[in-house]
Amino acid sequence: LEHCPFGVSEATSHPLSVEELTVYLLRDKSVYQLSGGGVTFSGGDPIIHISELFPLLEKLKEEQIHCTIETTLYCKDSAILLESVSYINEWIVDLKFQKENYREDYDDVMTFNLRLLRNLGVNISFRLVFVESMEADEIVERLKKLGVLSLEVLKCHALAESKYTKLGLPFRHYVPSTKSYLDFITALLMAGVDVKELAL
């Protein structure tokens, strides 16, 4: 679409070929090399369409660009997941422990894929968005079952509220109180989890 049919927002993207996107990303190659950075693929969840990224990932690998993916690991095609390992240097696993995001088979699928990646010795870190409905004891138990010793935590925010308002849609507030957030962080630390707090 050239523009939003509801007149709510303007176009913020345009299609690029793999070649065009590669050229665009390689403009910062010297910065990547100096900083130890690279290219990160994230949100929604790029693992859902990872095969479509293979041509781009292959070109970035040829250029020795460090590639990171942020994903829930909710992928039922383990063959595709295994194929992607050769292109991805770092995996950020976005843990979906919010009750509002519950899927009956999420734990099984994610745990299976996590085991696959660990067996291959890939670099994995874990991230969690904290919302008010989360119970610290329950989260700690789930982290223990997954063998998560270190966790990046982001406090839920309400940045999307204005977008919902423009669309005339109800906005559900998940932003936790400062007390519940600090209590959660304390519970993680007391359980021996190495916590890194993320800020926007």
Language model: regions and residue ranges:
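A C-terminal junction/extension of Radical SAM enzymes
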Residues: K179-L200
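Iron-sulfur cluster-binding cysteine motifs and their immediate structural context
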Residues: L1-H14
